[in-house]
Amino acid sequence: MRFHEHTATPQFEPDLRRNFSYPSGHTILGWTSALLLTEINPERADTILKRGMMYGESRVIVGAHWQSDVDAGRLAAAAVYSRMHTSERFLEQMRLARQEFRIKAGLATIVEMKAYKKEAEKRAKAAAKAAAKAKKAASN
């Protein structure tokens, strides 16, 4: 690994050398994505989390951030992701995402597939009912 090389954004180098440090937005995105995907596919957690770590480390390697910026980005991502778990809507969407992933990846049992199909039909009926209601309201 090489350090003190030019950054991936040489046009910003003069400013980056004089500016204060800040949490890495790239790291926040990468680590949040890794946490989310790990929850959907826990069987691949090691691989997914390593990739999420590398996403942040790349910011140090190219000279865009200090290591502390990347560490702060991961901390911010973990805090936000933790907070998302207080939302019933988020938890329901995660449950559906895990279910859909297991089916599409061929990991679901027959019971899980039947339950998913039944829920999908229920959601489709509710969506059709809401669309009809909206159409009726728009025509009045």
Q: What is the predicted function of each stretch?
A:
Residues R2-S139:
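Membrane-embedded catalytic cores of phosphoryl/pyrophosphoryl-handling enzymes
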